[in-house]
Each structure stands twice: as structure tokens, then as C-alpha cells.
């Protein structure tokens, strides 16, 4: 029998990164082909409170999972991103928006080193609309992104044929265009 429990739904600013993040990384996968467009360097942060049934990375929900984020790891990520065939950085988890201290440090360095030559993608259980009501650190992180895949994974809407998404409620959002227009703009390369 399929599980009918739903993910947790926080009130605006109920979950603050400063109250939860231990600055742990669940995994780092350089030269990845599945976490966004092109070749990516994917950073999986530790800790998520959404607790989505059917989560593909349940171990990373634990804020203690993995290892502490270090300067050595950051330097390795930057070195890997410097390869000409790497298109960009991807933040996943866990929940990147509950790990803003680590994620902001990294995305700021990526922009300093590469400008917009490398794109930045992030997955989040938060929807765009929820992030618009969130704390300043979450909004700051959002402003560094090029693409946001938003929304909690919903087992009842699971669809493995979707491009870069696990369930049909999730959207692939063009962040700069959405911020400029004040409304959600779907990524123009969306196939399905």
C-alpha cells in the first residue's frame, strides 16, 4: 500500500538555517550529468525538515550526516568548476535553503571566480512563493541562482519521465527572469 503521509509544511520563517544547519555536506559529486543541464559539480548539503515520503536521499535529511564543509572541499569544487567542459554548480540535499551559510559562501566564491560563465542550479522543497516570504539569507541565496527546481517531492505525483524533477508539482524556474518580472518564469529549455 502506498504511503499517504504528506511532507511537512512550514510557516514563513519558521525554519531558520541558523537554528538547524551544522554546515555538513552529505556528498560532493564532481562531473555529474544528472543534476541539471550539462556537466555539473553537485554539492549535497546535509539536513532537511520537509521529510517528504519517498525522498530519494533520505540519509541527507539528517543534519549530522556526512562531513563538515571545509575550505579544502571548497577549493576542490572551485578547481573542478574551472574545467572548461563543466557548465556549473548544483546545490541539492538535504535542503540548500536550510544550509545558507555554506551555500552562500560557495555561490559567492563561484560568482567571484567565474562571474556568470558557470551557472548555478538548486533544488528546494520550498516553493518560489514560500521563498518570497522567507528570511533574508534564503532570499540572498535565491538571488545568486540561475535555476531553481522548487517544491516538495509528492509521492502521489511521482513521474520519472519528467526532466530534472521527481514529481509533477515541481517546477524548473528561471530565477533571474522571475525576479525581474515579479512572477514565476518557467525555464525556456523545459522539455517535459
Language-model segments: residues:
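Conserved, mostly hydrophobic/aromatic
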Residues: 43, 95, 148
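P-loop/Walker A phosphate-binding loop and immediately adjacent motor/lid segment at beta-alpha junctions
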Residues: 99-111, 158-192
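Non-cysteine beta-strand/loop elements that form the S-adenosyl-L-methionine
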Residues: 145-154
Amino acid at each position: 500500500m502506498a504511503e499517504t503521509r504528506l511532507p511537512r509544511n512550514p510557516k514563513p520563517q519558521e525554519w531558520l538555517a541558523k537554528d538547524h544547519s551544522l554546515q555538513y555536506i552529505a556528498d560532493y559529486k564532481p562531473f555529474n550529468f544528472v543534476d541539471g543541464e550539462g556537466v555539473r559539480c553537485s554539492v549535497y548539503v546535509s539536513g532537511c525538515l520537509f521529510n517528504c515520503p519517498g525522498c530519494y536521499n533520505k540519509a541527507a535529511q539528517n543534519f549530522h550526516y556526512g562531513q563538515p564543509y571545509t575550505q579544502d572541499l571548497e577549493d576542490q569544487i572551485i578547481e573542478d568548476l574551472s574545467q572548461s567542459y563543466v557548465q556549473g554548480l548544483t546545490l541539492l540535499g538535504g535542503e540548500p535553503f536550510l544550509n545558507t551559510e555554506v551555500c552562500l559562501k560557495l555561490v559567492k566564491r563561484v560568482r567571484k571566480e567565474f562571474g556568470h560563465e558557470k551557472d548555478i542550479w538548486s533544488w528546494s522543497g520550498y516553493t518560489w512563493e514560500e521563498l518570497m516570504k522567507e528570511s533574508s539569507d534564503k532570499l540572498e541565496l535565491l538571488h545568486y541562482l540561475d535555476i531553481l527546481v522548487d517544491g516538495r517531492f509528492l509521492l502521489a505525483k511521482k513521474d520519472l519521465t519528467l526532466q530534472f524533477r521527481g514529481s509533477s508539482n515541481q517546477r524548473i524556474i528561471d530565477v533571474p527572469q522571475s525576479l525581474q518580472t515579479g512572477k514565476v518564469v518557467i525555464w525556456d529549455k523545459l522539455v517535459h
